[in-house]
């Protein structure tokens, strides 16, 4: 019996430690592109699902923090104005910190409840609960400038007379060779001349 217990103990010690919820918790990187004067968060639904939060609640927070208007269209989030991937990623991180992560055990196993009209974050892992803060809207400056050497996710809106695909980012027309209308691509801007920009494909993302 002692040999059995010793063998069992050795086996348990040799087993790798199970990964906790925190280690499994991964937030998708925001995938954005521009349509006219709007910013489209193409994987909005996937992000809300990963956070285990109501998409409407997440969207309301993002609109307030970005200081803009917008809506949910299917799996996408659409925002008025031009916002960088980093700007949106920063606000998602702020949402996670306030509405997802437990302040005691630092795990994401939480849910939102209302107690006496106060919105609370309750942790399923450790049982802790806390009120969430009422946040004031912050003015976030939307960027509409593209830069040489930078890579952007673009939606090809038309094809020029020479066969190059054309994407629009605010006042800029970006020419991307070997692309077709409706295609979404990642392209690196090689040259900017006035409001015209010339880019080359880095990756094809598919059709819109």
UniProtKB/Swiss-Prot annotation:
Q: Which GO terms describe its molecular function?
A: translation initiation factor activity
Q: Which PROSITE patterns match?
A: TRAM
Which residue pairs form cystines in this protein?
A: none
**Keyword Protein biosynthesis, does the record have it?**
yes
Task: Enumerate the UniProt keywords alphabetically.
Answer: Initiation factor, Protein biosynthesis
Q: Which ranges carry the TRAM domain? A: 145-203
Q: Does the keyword Protein biosynthesis apply?
A: yes
Which Gene3D superfamilies does this chain map to? 3.30.30.170, Nucleic acid-binding proteins
What the entry lists under SUPFAM superfamilies is as follows: Nucleic acid-binding proteins, Translation initiation factor 2 beta, aIF2beta, N-terminal domain, Zinc-binding domain of translation initiation factor 2 beta
Q: Which family does the record assign? A: Belongs to the eIF-2-beta/eIF-5 family.
Outline what the protein does. Answer: eIF-2 functions in the early steps of protein synthesis by forming a ternary complex with GTP and initiator tRNA.
Question: How does the record describe its quaternary structure?
Answer: Heterotrimer composed of an alpha, a beta and a gamma chain.
- Tell me what this protein is called: Translation initiation factor 2 subunit beta
Q: Which organism is it from?
A: Methanothrix thermoacetophila (strain DSM 6194 / JCM 14653 / NBRC 101360 / PT)
Ranked from the top, the taxonomy reads: Archaea, Methanobacteriati, Methanobacteriota, Stenosarchaea group, Methanomicrobia
């Amino acid at each position: 019996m002692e040999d059995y217990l010793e063998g069992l103990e050795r086996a348990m010690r040799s087993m790798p430690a199970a990964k906790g919820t925190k280690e499994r918790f991964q937030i998708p990187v925001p995938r954005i592109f521009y349509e006219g004067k709007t910013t489209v968060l193409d994987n909005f639904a996937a992000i809300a699902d990963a956070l285990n939060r109501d998409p409407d609640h997440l969207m309301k927070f993002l609109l307030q923090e970005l200081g803009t208007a917008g809506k949910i269209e299917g799996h996408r989030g659409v925002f008025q104005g031009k916002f960088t991937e980093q700007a949106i990623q920063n606000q998602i991180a702020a949402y996670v910190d306030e509405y997802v992560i437990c302040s005691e055990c630092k795990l994401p196993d939480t849910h939102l409840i209302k107690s006496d009209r106060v919105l609370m974050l309750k942790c399923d892992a450790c049982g802790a609960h806390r009120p969430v803060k009422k946040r004031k809207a912050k003015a976030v400056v939307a960027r509409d400038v593209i830069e040489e050497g930078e890579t952007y996710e673009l939606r090809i809106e038309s094809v020029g007379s020479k066969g190059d695909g054309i994407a629009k980012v605010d006042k800029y027309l970006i020419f991307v060779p070997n692309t077709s209308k409706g295609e979404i691509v990642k392209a690196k801007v090689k040259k900017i001349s006035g409001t015209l920009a010339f880019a080359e494909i880095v990756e094809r993302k598919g059709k819109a």
